[in-house]
């Protein structure tokens, strides 16, 4: 499953990344906006001028279809590792669920560009699930969740950046 979403921003890439990688904001985003049951920045090394790596761990209880819930349980705890490259204004990430990690591969990127005086975000996600008989169902669920979470995240970030 591949997903690509594009958003326009009325801020500089520097302002976007400063908020995105603010550890306190990341936790608030998950707890106040995305409905996470827990959220913690486990580590963040480097900075926005030279590049950084952040490990974020969060738990969620999304409304899952029966077969997905049976595989992953009521709560999904995810570890997200993001690597930011300031020269390309891009962060790449991997998301590893606590359950079925060996059968689930999720990676993506957020890239920012400047176009006509505004910032354009391109969010991309690639999810591959190798669970016999359930892979496509889980991939569709991941796509649905990604779209919903991105929409909520954008609104929350806009409130902070543009509000």
Language model: regions and residue ranges:
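Hydrophobic ligand-binding cavity/cleft-lining segments
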Residues: 1-64
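Hydrophobic pocket/interface hotspot
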Residues: 16-20, 123, 157
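A generic beta-sheet turn/junction motif
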Residues: 9-11, 86-88, 114-116
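A conserved amphipathic terminal alpha-helix motif
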Residues: 81-86, 135-163
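Residue-level preference for beta-strand/loop junctions
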Residues: 1, 74-76, 104
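Beta-strand/loop substructures that line and gate deep hydrophobic ligand-binding cavities in soluble
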Residues: 52, 78, 83, 92-143
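Soluble, non-transmembrane catalytic domains of enzymes that act on hydrophobic metabolites at membranes
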Residues: 2, 40-43, 98, 105-109, ...
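Glycine-rich portal/gate segments that line the openings of hydrophobic small-molecule binding cavities
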Residues: 40-95
């Amino acid at each position: 499953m591949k997903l690509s979403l594009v958003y326009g921003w009325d801020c500089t890439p520097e302002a976007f990344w400063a908020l995105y990688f603010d550890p306190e904001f990341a936790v608030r985003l998950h707890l106040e906006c995305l409905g996470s049951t827990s959220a913690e920045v486990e580590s963040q090394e480097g900075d926005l001028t030279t590049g950084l790596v952040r490990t974020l761990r969060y738990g969620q209880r999304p409304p899952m279809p029966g077969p997905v819930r049976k595989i992953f349980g009521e709560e999904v705890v995810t570890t997200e590792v993001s690597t930011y490259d300031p020269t390309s204004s891009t962060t790449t990430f991997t998301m590893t669920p606590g359950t079925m990690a060996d059968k689930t591969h999720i990676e993506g990127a957020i890239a920012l560009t400047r176009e006509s005086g505004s910032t354009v975000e391109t969010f991309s996600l690639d999810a591959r699930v190798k669970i016999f008989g359930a892979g496509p169902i889980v991939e569709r669920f991941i796509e649905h969740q990604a779209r919903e979470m991105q929409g909520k995240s954008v609104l929350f970030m806009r409130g902070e950046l543009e509000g």
